[in-house]
């Protein structure tokens, strides 16, 4: 059934725009250039406003998810990476549940990736229609069918650009993946902005700067009571404070520390005697994939809940899914869940919120740990990183594990890889929860993603440099 499904969508995949694989080896300097161009296009799209919108000043229903999904409200990057990640989530769940079967052949892998891209484009259209029809840019009846269609086309073209930029990097023209690059850029930009933002906000305490560090110097300069000024800089509510900044740095350090945890399995060449090596199985075996997929799941749940709340306010089942409230305290207007399933799947705002509603905190912890472990375990089956796939790769390289025959390698790898995937997913979820409870800037999920992505790029740079043999190749 699975192969038939992939064969059915094959004609549709053939007409999709595609980036061709490079016919030659792309040099490191070229990869850096293409990565910079990709990032530049993304950042430009983040600043170009959508043409035709009447208003985007209403409460932002996806404020909490924008950092993670690399989206920017009212611009071409309104959807961010949400369509790509959502399509990946759907295809992974279908493959993990054996509803579709993905073989080991390059043909099946290519069809699977094509199906993911096709679903990504369909989801882009669907999300664009939902955003417009729910009144995010103004009343659709007042805007008219022409303007509504124009906004949908803009969002679709922008979504297609993101898909192709991601594919450009994944095909080997650049470094890493577009998804990772866009997420890390967005999160780091948010952290820097929250620390140094010169924007002023009117609060009950008077006019204050949004940036935590700028606010520290401003409070020390304007307050006569310096001790009180310091206390306010560390603990002020509804705006970034120094405690949030310290928590962010602490979480960065903890995640980098855990990145070094791994088990090295001894392997040796079956062809050449005396040639030994190790195969590392990291604690974060699936890296940040579990947290990305978990974010996609929650964001789509938010979209559905917001849409239903707008159309069927007061309905019991809709309220069971989620009830929402608007706030503009200490920043832009935003909507946040105050009841229903969406409330329990959203992180507590602070450690004080944990004490106020421990049931909410407990359900959130269980959801984060369980979903990250589940996505981590299922991801290895569809991404070519399971014990069977690794054993096949070692066999192709004519490498065997010390003290084991080729036939027993899969059994030995099965002792480590599924455990590393599940436990690594649990750790990722646990660290994300810890960062949320500490009040880290950019959310716990965002910090986890930023650190793991930056570490991935560090490893890519080290690998490229080792292949070139010297640091000199970094310079023109």
UniProtKB/Swiss-Prot annotation:
On the Lumenal side, which residues? 54-76, 139-144, 194-240, 310-354, 442-445
What the entry lists under PROSITE patterns is as follows: SECY_1 (PS00755), SECY_2 (PS00756)
Q: Which parts of the sequence lie on the Cytoplasmic side of the lipid bilayer?
A: 2-33, 97-117, 166-172, 262-288, 376-420, 463-476
Give the record's membrane topology. Answer: Multi-pass membrane protein
Source taxon at top rank: Eukaryota
Q: Does the keyword Ligase apply?
A: no
Question: What does the record list as GO biological process?
Answer: pronephric nephron development; protein targeting to ER; protein transport
- Tell me which Gene3D superfamilies the record gives: SecY subunit domain
SUPFAM superfamilies with a match to the protein in the record? Preprotein translocase SecY subunit
Instruction: Cite the entry's keywords alphabetically.
Output: Developmental protein, Endoplasmic reticulum, Membrane, Protein transport, Translocation, Transmembrane, Transmembrane helix, Transport
Q: Record's Gene Ontology CC terms?
A: endoplasmic reticulum membrane
Quote the InterPro entries the UniProt record gives. SecY/SEC61-alpha, SecY_CS, SecY_dom_sf, Translocon_Sec61/SecY_plug_dom
Q: What job does this protein perform?
A: Component of SEC61 channel-forming translocon complex that mediates transport of signal peptide-containing precursor polypeptides across the endoplasmic reticulum (ER). Forms a ribosome receptor and a gated pore in the ER membrane, both functions required for cotranslational translocation of nascent polypeptides. May cooperate with auxiliary protein SEC62, SEC63 and HSPA5/BiP to enable post-translational transport of small presecretory proteins.
Extract the PANTHER family matched here. SECY/SEC61-ALPHA FAMILY MEMBER
Q: Which family does it belong to?
A: Belongs to the SecY/SEC61-alpha family.
This protein's assembly is summarised as: The SEC61 channel-forming translocon complex consists of channel-forming core components SEC61A1, SEC61B and SEC61G and different auxiliary components such as SEC62 and SEC63. The SEC61 channel associates with the multi-pass translocon (MPT) complex.
For this entry, the protein name equals Protein transport protein Sec61 subunit alpha isoform A
């Amino acid at each position: 059934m699975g192969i038939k499904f992939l064969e059915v969508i094959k004609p549709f995949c053939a007409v999709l725009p595609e980036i061709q694989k490079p016919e030659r080896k792309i040099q490191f300097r070229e990869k850096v250039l293409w990565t910079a161009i990709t990032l530049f296009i993304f950042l430009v799209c983040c600043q170009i406003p959508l043409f035709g919108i009447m208003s985007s000043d209403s409460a932002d229903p996806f404020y909490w998810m924008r950092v993670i999904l690399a989206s920017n409200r009212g611009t071409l990057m309104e959807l961010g990476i949400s369509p790509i990640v959502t399509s990946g989530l759907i295809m992974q769940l279908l493959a993990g549940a054996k509803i579709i079967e993905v073989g080991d052949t390059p043909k099946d892998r290519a069809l699977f990736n094509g199906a993911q891209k096709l679903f990504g484009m369909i989801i882009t259209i669907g999300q664009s229609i939902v955003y417009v029809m729910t009144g995010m840019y103004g009343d659709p009846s007042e805007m008219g069918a022409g303007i509504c269609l124009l906004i949908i086309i803009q969002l679709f073209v922008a979504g297609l650009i993101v898909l192709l930029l991601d594919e450009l990097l994944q095909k080997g023209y650049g470094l890493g993946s577009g998804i990772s690059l866009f997420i890390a850029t967005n999160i780091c930009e948010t952290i820097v902005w929250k620390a140094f933002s010169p924007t002023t906000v009117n609060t009950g305490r008077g006019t204050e700067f949004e940036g935590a560090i700028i606010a520290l110097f401003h409070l020390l300069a304007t307050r006569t009571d310096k001790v009180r000024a310091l206390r306010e800089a560390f603990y002020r509510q509804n705006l970034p404070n120094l405690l949030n900044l310290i928590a962010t740095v602490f979480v960065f350090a903890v995640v980098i520390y855990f990145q070094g945890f791994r088990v090295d399995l001894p392997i040796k060449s079956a062809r050449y005697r005396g040639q030994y090596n190790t195969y590392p199985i990291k604690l974060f075996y699936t890296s940040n994939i579990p947290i990305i997929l978990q974010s996609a799941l929650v964001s789509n749940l938010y979209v559905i809940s917001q849409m239903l709340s707008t159309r069927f306010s007061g309905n019991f089942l809709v309220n069971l899914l989620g009830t929402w409230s608007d706030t503009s305290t200490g920043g832009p207007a935003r909507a946040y869940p105050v009841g229903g399933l969406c409330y329990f799947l959203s992180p507590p705002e602070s450690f004080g919120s944990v004490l106020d509603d421990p049931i909410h905190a407990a359900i959130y912890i269980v959801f984060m740990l369980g979903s990250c472990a589940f996505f981590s375990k299922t991801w290895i089956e569809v991404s070519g990183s399971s014990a069977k796939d690794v054993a096949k790769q070692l066999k192709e390289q004519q490498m065997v594990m010390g003290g084991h025959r080729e036939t027993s390698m899969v059994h030995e790898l099965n002792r480590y890889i599924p455990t590393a995937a599940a436990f690594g997913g649990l750790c990722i979820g646990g660290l994300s929860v810890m960062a949320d409870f500490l009040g880290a800037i950019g959310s716990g999920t965002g910090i986890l993603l930023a650190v793991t992505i930056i570490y991935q790029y560090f490893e890519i740079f080290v690998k490229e440099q080792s292949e070139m043999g010297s640091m000199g190749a970094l310079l023109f």
